[in-house]
Amino acid sequence: MNELIFMVEEAPEGGFVARALGESIFTEADTIAELSGKVRDAVRCHFEEGKAPKIVRLHHVREEVITV
């Protein structure tokens, strides 16, 4: 695996959550900057030495409701 994508969303209670697509990896943090470090740690813990993807992408999803 060369690349892993995380979907990042704002948590209802505040902060952010990140879920890996195709892997059972989940983490959360209060800030985006903190989340990046936690994603790195979670990926390192999930994969065996030398098996982790080379690239991790954080795909930020933000839902906004507007009236028309």
Can you describe what each PLM-predicted range is?
Residues I5, V17, F26:
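Short aromatic/hydrophobic contact patches that present stacked aromatics
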Residues F16, E28, G37:
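Short acidic, gly/pro-rich beta-turn/loop elements at beta-sheet edges
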Residues M1-I5, A33, G37-V68:
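Short, charged, surface-exposed hinge/linker loops at domain edges
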Residues E23-A33:
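A short, exposed loop/beta-hairpin motif centered on an aromatic-Gly-Thr core
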Residues V8-A20:
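Short aromatic-glycine-(Arg/Gly/Cys) micro-motifs in beta-strand/loop hairpins
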